[in-house]
Amino acid sequence: MFMTYQPKKKQRKKEHGFRKRMSTLSGRKVLKRRRLKGRKRLTA
């Protein structure tokens, strides 16, 4: 077996970053919910 989590900054931003979230309707809903909840960090 090997470790399944191989962190990469670029990949993380591309998949879960602010620009990616803003690009789709559902992503914007995610940001809205996180703002309402009062999250300090909205995205990765």
UniProtKB/Swiss-Prot annotation:
The keyword Endoplasmic reticulum does not apply. GO terms for molecular function: structural constituent of ribosome. Keywords: Ribonucleoprotein, Ribosomal protein. One of its GO terms (biological process) is translation. Gene3D superfamilies: 1.10.287.3980. Residues 1-44 are annotated as: Disordered. PROSITE patterns: RIBOSOMAL_L34. One of its GO terms (cellular component) is ribosome. Residues 7-22, 29-44 have a biased composition (Basic residues). Belongs to the bacterial ribosomal protein bL34 family. This is Large ribosomal subunit protein bL34.
